[in-house]
Amino acid sequence: VGKLIDHGVLPASIAWIDPEFTAGDLGAKWRAVPSNTSVKLFINYLTGADSFRFAHAPHFALNDLAPTDTCLLGDVADPLVWITGQLCAQVSALRTRATGLALHGGRWEVQTELGEITSKNVILAVGSVPKKLAYPWLNEIPIEVALDPAKLAEQPLEGATVAVFGASHSSMIALPNLLAGPAAKVINFYRGPLRYAVDMGEWTLFDDTGLKGEAARWARENIDGVLPDRLQRCLVDSPEFPELLESCDYAVYTVGFSPRPIPAAPQWGQLECNAANGIIAPGLFGVGIAFPEYRIDPTGFGEYRVGLQKFMDRLNKTLPLWLKYGS
């Protein structure tokens, strides 16, 4: 929304649809989670659009943190909520959900819970949801609970054995959180070796798939170093996997995220987003964690770019194209 305004789109012609306007899942679910992004990059994002008016923002805790440090996502959510308020005051903010899309007469018809609106262009930033595995006999601890020490402390885990699936940033936060509680045992089921991000100066090796910050530090000491008491690791392809899985009472799935379904578009069937430029259809575009950019690094390794500043970088490159590739 901010970048559209910065590119000269009249605020009065922008309809922003969101059920809450509280900085999405980041503001609602992930505030207690340590980031894998430096404070400096968050500040770059917050100051990256004139329409954000961040120069006029009140003082936030984020302003007091060292630029090269990581932080809690809650430190970022607070200024994002403030910016949301600034943008909502400029555009038509509709507190609802989009449920359907159709293209007629060169304009997109967007069905919402409040009725229909039409537009020449539609940008989807629908977000993603955690993936799950099919072990229904295990009591699931939602990932947003496992990553929040206060919420996790409310779980009745005394004497329990907890399975943690995955070896991601989220995994390396959930594991120490669980080990700090009363669980009798924690078993980490994994598929391969850990991957760490390495700053190479002008680029970062494994920038989007490697461990960073506190998660990387903990993993080096406790996974690739000396396993803590009560923590066991098991390769999912090993013969021990079925028996160890059967011994578990609870499960935490830290195995990635899937894009939320986009509004139904029976006219087109299954729509796909071009990972190179964000185009879904003429006048229909995708941005954010549900539609990340795919980039190949100098070594030839490719990964999807996920992070607020990376979404901003993507918009800076693609928005001029989108504004010409209308319906």
Where are these regions (language model features)?
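Dinucleotide-binding Rossmann-like beta1-alpha1 core, especially the glycine-rich loop
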Residues: 31-82
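Flavin (primarily FAD) cofactor-binding/catalytic cores of flavoenzymes
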Residues: 2-21, 62-327
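Conserved N-terminal glycine-rich FAD pyrophosphate-binding loop of Rossmann-like flavoproteins
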Residues: 19-47, 197-209
